[in-house]
């Protein structure tokens, strides 16, 4: 009875989180007028999950239903951090900065807000994680997921996301060069007949 209800709740939560990620992706795709930038923003979400699992291992807690809810909250914070960074990169590019320069400047400009968001979240949740009362015991797995997930995903936001942005831009430029070569070659071939 209780185990089956717990499994059903877990499955429903995972499905709803997947649906939420798709909706977030769609909204960001419209806002950024891009299909790949929302993917970059969402890349840190799995790292938040990894951080949550590491946090549970470090503190000796088992992953529970409340842990999954903490991962969901963590995903929101992580998406916001990445959104702030990618938006700044795009604005700098619109102002005419070269890609690498825009990546460095955006990292510098958004370093403090991203770090402060993560650290204040982590430090603010420390009292709950160290609470020993019976009432707090059910919250500790959720708080552990949120705090360690945000802390771990912050490094990903500041290092991996700009690197992936650069790689994606390079791949896009490479694809355009191939397309131009193909069209030029096709044009030469059609001139032979």
How would you name each of these model-derived features?
Residues 23-109, 115-131, 148, 152, ...:
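Hydrophobic transmembrane alpha-helices and their membrane-interface caps
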Residues 104, 134-137, 163-193:
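Interfacial helix-loop-helix hairpins and adjacent transmembrane helices
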């Amino acid at each position: 009875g209780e185990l089956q209800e717990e499994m059903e709740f877990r499955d429903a939560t995972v499905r709803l989180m997947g649906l939420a990620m798709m909706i977030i992706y769609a909204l960001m795709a419209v806002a950024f007028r891009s299909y790949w930038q929302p993917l970059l923003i969402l890349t840190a979400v799995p790292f938040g999950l990894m951080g949550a699992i590491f946090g549970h291992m470090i503190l000796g807690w088992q992953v529970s239903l409340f842990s999954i809810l903490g991962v969901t909250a963590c995903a929101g914070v992580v998406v916001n951090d990445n959104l702030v960074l990618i938006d700044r990169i795009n604005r700098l590019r619109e102002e005419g900065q070269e890609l690498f320069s825009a990546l460095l400047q955006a990292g510098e400009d958004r370093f403090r807000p991203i770090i402060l968001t993560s650290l204040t979240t982590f430090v603010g949740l420390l009292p709950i994680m160290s609470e020993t009362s019976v009432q707090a015991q059910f919250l500790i797995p959720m708080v552990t997921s949120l705090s360690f997930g945000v802390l771990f995903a912050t490094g990903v936001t500041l290092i991996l996301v700009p690197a992936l942005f650069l790689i994606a831009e390079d791949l896009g430029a490479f694809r355009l060069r191939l397309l131009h070569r193909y069209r030029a070659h096709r044009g030469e071939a059609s001139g032979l007949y």
